Amino acid sequence: MTEEIGFELERQQESWFGSWLRWCPTSLSLLREAEKMLLSNLKSLYRGRYVNVGCTVGTEDSHIWTLSFNEESPKIPLVLLHGFGSGVGLWCLNYDALAAKRPIYAIDIVGFGRSSRPQFTRDPLEAEREFITTIEAWREKMNLEKFILLGHSFGGFLAASYAIKHPERISHLILADPWGFPERPLDVGRNSTIPLWVRAIGAILQPFNPLFIVRTAGPWGPKLLQKARPDLIRKFSGVVKDSEEVIPNYLYHCNAQNPTGESAFHALMAGFGWAKYPMIHRMDSLRKEVPITLIYGSRSWVDRDPGFQIKYTRQESYVDVVVIKGAGHHVYADRAEVFNELVNYIGDNVDNGTLPKKMSMNPDLVEGEEARNAGVTLTNMLNVRNDNMQDVTQATVEDTDNPEESEKDAV
């Protein structure tokens, strides 16, 4: 059940499409319907609304599409930033569990999803500043003093950048398989964790926006996504009804529109897997009082060495690195139950004014090569919880036997 506000903005923005609609069968109305289908399985009440953040990018006011859950709770809020090419809908496996604990706010990052799509500057540092300025303007409008900030992939990159700029707002920074942290290697091909087919496609498409092929496919775009990403569809199949249609339909309508956020991402990237200005070189600017948890999937293509580097260089700060065994890049969906338990555990400690016990209790698993290559379970973390969580502590996660899953999970 939901309350949604601000449809008139979507009708105004749809004037952009014009003749484009003759080839790409999309609109903000269709995106709204696709999102509603994706969220129809939720048990939690939520409110969807547009938040006017003023002129933070371009020459006109931007409006940020926002979902909020459990706003009446006095607990510390959790703010969710999605990854590249995504939107608020893909957190659908997490909302119910997380909203049971505290207020949840999820936004479509400016330039993506149902939010405004203004023209960003092509300068990478200035484009990043525009993203961060918009997030801060949204925070001010929402009257959030302090919160837990969780970002996935590109959202993790932006979350880290925001925390560096506004550390006083962050109760805990959670980075889920964050993009853009490592330095691009001189020899990209050698020892790269990014699958060869992704690197090949990335080289061919380097001059273009990453998802232009979805728009080029026109009316065949949803089918293209359905064929290209069956692995992503499977992640949601146990919860989302008709996921084989709903997931690609949602992703298509998220990405078949004016790709301004995508263009800004393209300006920031140095090849698909790297940022022109890697975040690893900037984390020493983050105030030491800000606690950080980095969550990786053991089968993800994202390089997790920067997470361990951050842990070892911020000796005076709380930093924990957790690798969820069997999860890929979409760690929040691959092992949703474990991911939700981990985030709730962190949140409980924030509420109590304590730092979480390190989830990586066993140094043989976490600090050695075994942890870097195979991942760790969350048994030690979950054992500190109440006895009524005993059934969860027994459910340690096993690695998948299908090597293709980590490759398909690359984008």
Tell me what each language-model feature is.
Residues 2-46, 74, 125-133, 140-141, ...:
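Flexible "cap/lid" subdomain of the alpha/beta-hydrolase fold that forms the substrate-access gate
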Residues 76, 83, 87, 104, ...:
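Short amphipathic alpha-helical molecular recognition features
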Residues 85, 109-113, 180, 300-301, ...:
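Alpha/beta-hydrolase active-site loop signature
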Residues 302, 321, 327-341:
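Catalytic histidine-centered segment of alpha/beta-hydrolase-like enzymes
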